[in-house]
Design a protein with these regions (language model features):
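Metal-dependent nuclease catalytic cores that hydrolyze phosphodiester bonds in DNA/RNA
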Residues: 1-122, 129-137
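Secondary-structure boundary elements
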Residues: 115-119, 148-153
Length: 153
């Protein structure tokens, strides 16, 4: 083994630790910041695949480490956007709640809301692995629901 080489066994142990620990840490963080997502319908649930959303409420969804890292990249993007809007009158992670006509809880967690005396602007931050020319329909539906809930506030 070379002088500065890290032993393979250490790297294997570290990989195993990360694979076991990262999902637990992220699940705890999500519950602390968004609540138990199985107990309410979120704006992204309504805007996305309804079957996938329904099943995610009934059974715990397991994600690969690669998928967890992709999700975290989105959170890092939010931090960059927050730096970009510093100095404006913004609020971060604004939670809005309502109920459907048949009593289900709906919650939306708006990444950012910038307000002045005339208007409120919702910023929903998305990160993608490839450039996107037009927003996806699910993104548009999500932001429309968020704006509707914000208007009802």
């Amino acid at each position: 083994m070379a002088k500065n080489e890290i032993p393979r066994s250490f790297l294997n142990d570290l990989d195993a630790y990360i694979e076991k620990n990262l999902p637990k840490v992220l699940e705890k963080y999500t519950t602390e910041t968004l609540g138990d997502r199985s107990k309410y319908i979120g704006a992204s649930d309504i805007a996305g695949c309804l079957r996938k959303s329904f099943l995610s409420k009934k059974e715990k969804v397991e994600h690969s480490i690669a998928k967890h890292i992709i999700f975290q990249r989105g959170h890092l993007t939010e931090q960059i956007v927050e730096l970009m809007i510093t100095g404006t009158n913004y609020k971060k992670q604004v939670e809005l709640c309502s109920k459907t006509y048949n009593g289900f809880d709906i919650k939306a967690h708006l990444d950012f809301v910038i307000e002045n005396e005339k208007r409120a602007v919702v910023l929903e931050v998305k990160s993608t692995s490839t450039p996107v020319d037009e927003p996806y329909e699910s993104w548009i539906l999500q932001i429309q629901l968020q704006m509707g809930l914000l208007q009802k506030r």
